[in-house]
Design a protein with these regions (language model features):
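Bacterial C-terminal helix-turn-helix
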Residues: 1-59
């Protein structure tokens, strides 16, 4: 049961990061503020989940 809860929490966290980056067009500093986490924490979580800020930047 704990494993299921951990997976659900990780997926929710990953989705929140993606939504924040989408809302800020890939600006990590703004996304960190939006999520109320330290910039370094966001950077480490992005690396953990394989999320690149460039995916969310407008060309």
């Amino acid at each position: 049961m704990r494993e299921i809860a951990d997976r659900a929490a990780a997926e929710a966290e990953r989705q929140a990061i993606r939504l924040a980056l989408q809302a800020t067009q890939g600006n990590k500093s703004q996304a960190a503020r939006l999520l109320r986490v330290d910039y370094k924490t966001l950077h480490l979580k992005m690396k953990h989940y394989g999320i690149e800020a460039a995916e969310f930047r407008m060309s």
